[in-house]
């Protein structure tokens, strides 16, 4: 994957989301699979709905949560890889 902060992500139109108790449940209509996001994953998902720019997502999460830049970069990379692998998001060219 290219530099995480330089990519733009687009949420698949086949994915529907619903917040439940501070977490988010994602339903992929193509695979009929459910996915769950914790509190921070939910915030990332909300930010992706507002902006496809990972740099903006990174900066917002960094200011809202008590996390070091290096750890956030690693955690976002893992989350983005899982979302891509599941087909929930796509990289914008």
Explain the meaning of each model-derived region.
Residues 1-42, 46, 92-93:
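Acidic, low-complexity/disordered tracts enriched in E/D and polar residues
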Residues 33-93:
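Long, charge-rich, low-complexity alpha-helical segments
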């Amino acid at each position: 994957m290219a530099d995480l902060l330089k990519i733009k992500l687009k949420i698949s139109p086949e994915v529907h989301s619903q917040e439940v108790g501070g977490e988010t449940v994602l339903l992929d209509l193509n695979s009929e699979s459910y996915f769950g996001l914790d509190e921070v994953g939910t915030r990332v998902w909300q930010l992706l709905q507002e902006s496809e720019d990972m740099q903006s997502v990174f900066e917002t999460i960094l200011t809202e949560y008590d996390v070091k830049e290096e750890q956030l970069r690693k955690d976002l990379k893992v989350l983005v890889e899982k979302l891509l692998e599941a087909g929930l998001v796509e990289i914008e060219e």
